[in-house]
Amino acid sequence: MKGLIIIGSAQVGSHTNALSKYLKGQLGEHDVEVEIFDLAEKPIHQLDFAGTTQAVDEIKNNVKSLQSKAMEADFLILGTPNYHGSFSGILKNALDHLNMDHFKMKPVGLICNSGGIVSSEPLSHLRVIVRSLLGIAVPTQIATHDSDYAKLEDGTLYLEDNEFQLRAKLFVDQIVSFVTNSPYEHLK
């Protein structure tokens, strides 16, 4: 079983990235192969977090890589920071390079992090997009806050909150169950 986590944050080492790494570890306990596609590290938009323009060839290669990995994946997880009550433009740009063939009847997990007011609104917006792309958004979603994380001595963030660790377990179990017991395989 293969999964792809797409991180729509412009910041390297983001809270969304920390949550994605935590989920990758949890999925690994189910012998699931997971790749994280962090758009801060592999940009497909024109400007990076520092405001510099990426080389056109680099963008094209990143788009091809994203499309290939999404096609190979049995499930996807979309991760975003909460940007003004919605998901990031960077994630929207990435999704614009994918189509129904990448999502059709695949389980899709939704995660986000808020620095300010905790909100699941970005996930509600993504849920509509997943449905439009014929994906199946799993019922459990994760919306964290910066305060749910702690830092290691080197500054690396990690999910510290026990409640969200339990929610992450349910989230992972649902994704694995949807892939393993898919009643929609014949519709792909």
Swiss-Prot record:
- Going by the record, the broad EC class of this enzyme is oxidoreductase
Q: Which Gene3D superfamilies match?
A: 3.40.50.360
The alphabetical list of record keywords is: Flavoprotein, FMN, NADP, Oxidoreductase
Query: In Gene Ontology terms, what is one molecular function of this protein?
Result: oxidoreductase activity
Q: Which cofactor does it need?
A: FMN
- Which InterPro entries does the record cross-reference, listed alphabetically? Flavoprotein-like_sf, FMN_Rdtase-like_dom, NAD(P)H-dep_reductase
Pfam families xref list: FMN_red
Q: Which domain of life is it from?
A: Bacteria
Q: What Enzyme Commission number(s) appear in the record?
A: 1.7.-.-
Entry GO CC: cytosol
Q: Which SUPFAM superfamilies match?
A: Flavoproteins
Function summary: Catalyzes the reductive cleavage of azo bond in aromatic azo compounds to the corresponding amines. Requires NADPH, but not NADH, as an electron donor for its activity.
Summarize the subunit comment: Homotetramer.
Q: Which family does it belong to?
A: Belongs to the azoreductase type 2 family.
The name of this protein is FMN-dependent NADPH-azoreductase
Q: What organism is this sequence from?
A: Staphylococcus epidermidis (strain ATCC 35984 / DSM 28319 / BCRC 17069 / CCUG 31568 / BM 3577 / RP62A)
